[in-house]
């Protein structure tokens, strides 16, 4: 594996073996042009067994229906045999001839199923800034760069059109994934809007503290991402009494929504959203 730009932390052996197995499986099933890594593994904040494994497999042409079925089987087999990292694989399958438009949807695999979604400006910027090349051409050879204006517009639209309305659905925020992504996305978006840079999830925790996020939320998030693997994340790690354990998800949801609403509004107002 080589970096598209600077060298990063070594890939954990089990994840490296998984990537080799996945690459071989792709080469046997689809017309593979390149395989790239982005997200936490490429950015240097990867927590094996906890982080998603974010990949882009560039195809020489669109996958056929038969190839889509083959990809589904490959992902299911990896998830059954490859451990936690394999179950966390998210992979986009764009056609190399259709990479110009950041809004265009491409075949992908996430959350245990095939779907279609865009290769977003944030993903594209990650690939150019710190993407890892597992196979084939690097991003610079085939992936158009996004402008700062495109990146800013996407980040603002994501906050305004997705995350702010999501706060109107209290049940969403009872789940770890919504709490984590909502908080981390706000912090990372704020930094990107401020200076154009991309930060890791670990760095986002410090940003959230500076934005006034409640300490119990940050302790809970930090524990689930970085705490001892044998210790179940929960309210004890977040400074909440054990007697309140059953009530913590609801309390955490309230804290998260109460913080995120005004914080998102301030960020949108500060960076030019009308």
Which residues fall in each region the model found?
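Conserved NTP/Mg2+-binding pocket subregion across the NTase superfamily
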Residues: 2-7, 72-175, 183, 189
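Helical scaffold of the NTase/Pol beta-like nucleotidyltransferase catalytic core
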Residues: 1-36, 66-68, 274
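Long, highly charged amphipathic alpha-helices
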Residues: 17-25, 70-77, 258, 262
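Short, solvent-exposed polar/charged micro-motifs at secondary-structure junctions
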Residues: 44-47, 99-104, 229
């Amino acid at each position: 594996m080589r970096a598209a730009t600077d060298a990063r932390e070594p890939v954990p052996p089990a994840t490296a073996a998984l990537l080799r197995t996945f690459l071989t499986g792709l080469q046997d099933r689809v017309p593979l042009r390149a395989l790239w890594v982005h997200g936490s593994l490429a950015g240097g904040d990867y927590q094996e067994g906890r982080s998603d494994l974010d990949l882009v497999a560039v195809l020489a042409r669109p996958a056929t229906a038969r190839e889509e079925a083959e990809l589904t089987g490959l992902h299911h087999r990896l998830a059954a045999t490859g451990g936690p990292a394999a179950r966390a694989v998210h992979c986009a399958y764009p056609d190399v001839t259709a990479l110009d438009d950041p809004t265009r949807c491409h075949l992908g695999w996430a959350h245990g199923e095939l779907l279609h979604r865009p290769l977003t400006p944030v993903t594209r910027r990650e690939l150019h800034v710190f993407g890892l090349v597992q196979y084939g051409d690097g991003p610079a050879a085939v992936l158009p760069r996004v402008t700062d204006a495109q990146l800013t517009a996407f980040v603002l639209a994501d906050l305004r059109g997705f995350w702010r309305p999501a706060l109107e659905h209290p049940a969403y925020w009872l789940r770890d994934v919504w709490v984590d992504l909502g908080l981390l996305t706000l912090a990372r978006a704020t930094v990107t809007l401020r200076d154009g840079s991309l930060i890791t999830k670990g760095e986002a925790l410090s940003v959230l503290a500076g934005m006034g996020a409640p300490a119990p939320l940050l302790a809970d998030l930090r524990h689930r991402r970085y705490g001892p693997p044998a210790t179940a994340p929960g309210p004890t790690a977040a400074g909440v009494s054990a007697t309140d354990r059953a009530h913590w998800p609801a309390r955490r949801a309230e804290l998260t929504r109460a913080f995120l609403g005004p914080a998102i509004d301030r960020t949108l107002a500060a960076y030019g959203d009308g």
